[in-house]
Design a protein with these regions (language model features):
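Short, well-ordered beta-strand segments in beta-rich or mixed alpha/beta enzyme
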Residues: 2-8, 38-65
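Short, surface-exposed ligand-recognition loops at beta-strand->loop->(often short) alpha-helix junctions
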Residues: 8-19
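An amphipathic, aromatic/His-enriched active-site/gating alpha helix that lines ligand/cofactor pockets
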Residues: 23-36, 54-88
Length: 89
């Protein structure tokens, strides 16, 4: 299962947001079922960012987001994501 979150972030917030994405990836990486993940800034439009993660199954992804640590550290960052479907087979 692949989860993709895209973000539109003003250029002035880019370095801070990169650090936030690193924290987010670190939080998710500790969850059972996490396989791997990457994040990056779009080359053509530097205000666009993505976080892509791979999971054993959709249940492990959903459980990761419902953990206390995720609610405190990850969800506030994910709340900034562009509102669009992000779960893929």
């Amino acid at each position: 299962m692949h989860a993709i979150a895209r973000f539109s972030i003003p250029l002035g917030q880019a370095s801070e947001f990169r650090a936030q994405l690193a924290t987010l990836q670190s939080v998710l990486a500790q969850a059972p079922g996490f396989i791997d993940g990457v994040f990056g800034q779009n080359l053509d439009d530097p205000t666009l960012w993505h976080l892509s993660t791979n999971w054993e199954n959709v249940g492990s992804y959903r459980r990761a987001l419902s953990s206390t640590r995720a609610k405190l550290e990850a969800i506030p960052i994910l709340a900034r994501a562009i509102d669009e479907p992000g779960a893929y087979e």
